[in-house]
């Protein structure tokens, strides 16, 4: 009877809740968990759908609104972000009062509101929104003042803009304050003042994106003398191919309105704001490319960041917006292929670069294309692309032409043509004698073939001086000691390499050899078997299997 009464009361209570609180359906824990898991895996669309479900269940859920605001930004949906931002500000407010509960608003909400107001030509509201970013994860006085300065970046209000920048402490982010003074004066057509501040900023630091903006300024304003001297003064360390692409431009402004100037501040925020987490850094990059679409350097840096987060699909999408003829175009194409490669899809990486070189004869693209063919053991195709790279490298006097000869040497060594391999490896060293990887590769090859042992040791020691504690080079030196019968010396070095690279098949194979020579036969067989298990390319499986049966 007691159980029946309790059951009846529970049913009555639940019915009452459903009748009187239809507007509130408690969110399920599972919704939060799925949203969290999707967010961690960069699946922002799925995450957004689950938070939208939570929001429908409880429109005043501040957590759901704040997450929807951020996720909309990450998804590149500024319109929705702005909508959620205003909902967040008004959540729980008295609808009869024409006000917002601004305490609900997050720093990213104020940021999005400011961008929206500026885009709607409401500078006063934009300034107020940016000025409200004084707390939370985006709190930085220089960041806020630069945002506000761009709100007033107009010939009629430029004094107000400069007054805000002048509030930034002397020496604190000096370079960026000079850059933004130059950009704002440039936008306001104060040519002489812009020129002064460009010169001052470049005397402190020479970032490529600032150089690009400065050259655009010189080109637009027909400052011929400085424009003609630009390459010698600022690009002398770059090769001719890079210079040609950099200097090929039209006279269109890169920063065409204050909102695009805000994009540069958002790009700079990574240097200004301390302890940014990955999500907020991602948000700021996304807002930067949305607000300043003409500054392609932001896209390139953002894509590198996305690849580090293993968000390769979005990285490729961002890179695809960089024009192929831009000075970063070939590097963007290579990074797109790298993103495919990170996913284990070298075939797509090759297809992408093949398409690119039809449009642009690029040394870097052909070199990268040769590398991908080498990874796939397409020896003939690798050599063909390296030959293209060599022609372009000689034409433009590329400093890293040694790298092409090095890779050609690797192809010939792997395809059992040692004479050509040795010739190209030596040619590489002749062009650049302090290349640790080339010294190590040639030295190790000599040792493995029992040739030029003393010369090989000198090469490996030189490599070790250039790259101390590199586990591959340490392994090569250990292999030298093994070959000359100094097994204890070899053992201590291999233990270091094994700690650094426990999953490298060559190191495990070498470690097994040394253990066998020192009488630890059972343990040696364990490491030989491990080498076979780790050898995905089956380079020396048969050789190691013989050792498992017979020893050495």
Predicted regions and their residues:
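N-terminal leader/linker segments that initiate helical-solenoid repeat arrays
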Residues: 19-84, 93-108, 173, 238, ...
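Position-specific recognition of the canonical hydrophobic site in helix A of tetratricopeptide repeat
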Residues: 39, 73, 118, 153, ...
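Structural marker of alpha-solenoid helical repeat scaffolds
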Residues: 57, 90-94, 102-103, 136-137, ...
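TPR alpha-solenoid repeat register
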Residues: 64, 109, 144, 177, ...
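Canonical tetratricopeptide repeat
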Residues: 67-68, 112, 147, 180, ...
């Amino acid at each position: 009877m007691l159980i029946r009464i309790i059951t009846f009361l529970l049913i009555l209570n639940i019915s009452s809740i459903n009748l009187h609180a239809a507007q509130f359906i408690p969110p399920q824990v599972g919704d939060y968990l799925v949203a969290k898991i999707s967010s961690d895996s960069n699946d922002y669309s799925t995450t957004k759908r689950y938070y939208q479900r939570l929001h429908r269940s409880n429109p005043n859920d501040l957590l759901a609104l704040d997450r929807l605001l951020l996720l909309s930004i990450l998804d590149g949906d500024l319109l929705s972000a702005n909508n959620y931002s205003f909902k967040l500000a008004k959540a729980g407010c008295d609808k009869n009062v024409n006000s917002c509960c601004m305490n609900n608003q997050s720093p990213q909400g104020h940021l999005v509101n400011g961008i929206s107001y500026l885009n709607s030509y409401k500078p006063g509201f934009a300034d107020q929104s940016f000025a409200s970013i004084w707390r939370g994860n985006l709190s930085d006085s220089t960041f806020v003042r630069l945002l506000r300065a761009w709100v007033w970046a107009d010939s009629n209000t430029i004094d107000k803009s400069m007054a805000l920048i002048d509030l930034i402490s002397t020496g604190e982010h000096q370079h960026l304050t000079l850059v933004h003074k130059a950009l704002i004066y440039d936008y306001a057509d104060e040519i002489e003042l812009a020129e002064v501040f460009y010169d001052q900023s470049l005397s402190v630091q020479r970032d490529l994106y600032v150089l690009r903006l400065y050259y655009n300024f010189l080109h637009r304003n027909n400052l011929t003398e400085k424009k003609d001297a630009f390459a010698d003064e600022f690009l002398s360390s770059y090769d001719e191919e890079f210079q040609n692409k950099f200097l090929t431009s039209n006279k269109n402004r890169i920063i065409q309105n204050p909102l695009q100037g805000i994009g540069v501040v958002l790009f700079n925020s990574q240097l200004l704001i301390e302890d940014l987490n990955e999500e907020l850094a991602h948000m700021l990059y996304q807002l930067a490319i949305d607000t300043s679409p003409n500054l392609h350097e932001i896209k390139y840096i953002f894509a590198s960041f996305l690849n580090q987060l293993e968000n390769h699909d979005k990285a490729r999408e961002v890179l695809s917006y960089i024009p192929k003829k831009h000075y970063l175009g070939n590097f963007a194409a290579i990074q797109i292929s790298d993103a495919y490669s990170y996913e284990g899809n070298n075939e797509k990486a090759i297809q992408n670069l093949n398409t690119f070189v039809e449009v642009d004869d690029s040394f870097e693209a052909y070199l990268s294309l040769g590398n991908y063919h080498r990874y796939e053991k397409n020896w003939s195709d690798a050599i063909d692309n390296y030959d293209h790279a060599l022609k372009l490298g000689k034409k433009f006097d590329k400093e890293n032409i040694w790298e092409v000869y090095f890779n050609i040497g690797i192809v010939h060594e792997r395809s059992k043509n040692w004479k050509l391999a040795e010739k190209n490896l030596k040619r590489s060293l002749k062009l650049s004698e302090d290349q640790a990887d080339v010294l190590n590769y040639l030295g190790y090859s000599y040792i493995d073939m029992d040739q030029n042992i003393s010369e090989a040791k000198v090469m490996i020691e030189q490599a070790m001086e250039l790259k101390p504690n590199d586990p591959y080079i340490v392994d090569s030196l250990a292999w030298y000691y093994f070959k000359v019968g100094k097994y204890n010396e070899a053992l201590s070095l291999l233990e270091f390499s094994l700690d650094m690279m426990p999953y490298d098949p060559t190191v495990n194979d070498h470690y097994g050899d040394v253990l066998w020579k020192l009488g630890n036969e059972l343990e040696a067989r364990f490491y030989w078997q491990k080498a076979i298990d780790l050898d995905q390319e089956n380079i020396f499986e048969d050789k190691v299997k013989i050792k498992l049966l017979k020893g050495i």
